[in-house]
Each structure stands twice: as structure tokens, then as C-alpha cells.
Amino acid sequence: GTPILHREKFSSADGLGHFFGIEYRPPAEVADEEYPFTLMTGRLLFHYHTRTQTGRAKILHHEVPEAYVQINTEDAARLNIKNGEKIRLRSRRGEAEAIARVTDEVGPGVLMMTMHFSGKGSVNQLTNTALDPMSKMPELKHSAVAVEKITEVQ
């Protein structure tokens, strides 16, 4: 073995790398009237997986102490959601709660929720279990959800 694979050539008969395109397949679940947002899961710089290690580091916990959801500025305004408010996401599989981060880093109709938290902040309560037929990877980047602001009365 070598520290870097394929530095001089690939391990194919002709020494070249071969790429193959695949036919586009739409996601198993798309946004609709009841669940109008597309949810993506995402990682953070400050935490690793479910925080079994990074969650105990005070400085890392201080940076991101709880789950958050990035929501587009236009969507937040339409739903009267302010930055830092608690929101609830609902899918066909469950619900989760997190802090809203209003931003233009995600497009309209798209939400990004951190994947590192458990309990009410667990994005896995929402994600679609459909598997890609080729890779067998779950569609964690494409789940239809609804969003609502959590009020004191609820």
C-alpha cells in the first residue's frame, strides 16, 4: 500500500480513472401541501456525530449547546419566525424541536437541521428511511416536513 492511493495511476487495466453516470432518480418523498419544506441534515464544525465525545467538551458545547434549524429569511418572515425562537418540525414519521436560525444560507423551501443532538432535538425522528437503490444509503438529505413556531401557550 501507499499513503496516497492512485498518485501515479488508477488500478484499472489502462491506468485511467473511469467514471460512470447514473440515471437521475427523484427522491422517494417530496414536499407537498401538508409538508411543504424539504429538510436536509447537516454536520457542524464543533460536534462529531452524536456528541458522545464533543458534547463533554465545555468549549464545544458553549459554541453550539442545542439543536438548530436553518430557515430561509423569506420563509421565516412568512411564518413569523424570528431568529433564536423555538420551532417544531413535523414529518410523516415524527417531530423534533430546535432553535430557528434565520439565514439566506439555505434557499426558500429548504431547511437544514443539525444531526448531532438527541431527545426532542433529534433530526432522526423526521428523516426518511427510504434507501437509494444503488448505494443503499438512506435519504437523509431529502425529507418533507412542516414547520411551526412554538408558543408559550402550547
Tell me what each language-model feature is.
Residues E34, T50, T54-Q70, E74-Q154:
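Long, contiguous, secondary-structure-rich segments that constitute the structural scaffold
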Residues G1-I59:
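Long, low-complexity segments enriched in small/aliphatic residues
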